[in-house]
């Protein structure tokens, strides 16, 4: 249930999606730009929660940390694949 708790928090799935879609580590500001309208404090909180859950990690590159999904995060995206397929089908019927 803790995983659903984390994934149900506002912006969490969007952060995971953007980290996955980027394909390479991404800096905080770039990630914030991709997540339209998210405050820096909320993004910081979500990244911390995802790091503590083992879903995301940061790598120091120069002076800025860059964020990426861990192997566990990649597994999560794979597990969510059927949900994405269902949501596309649902959207087409609306």
Name every feature range the model reports, one short phrase each.
Residues 17-18, 22, 68-71, 75-94:
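Amphipathic alpha-helical dimerization/coiled-coil segments
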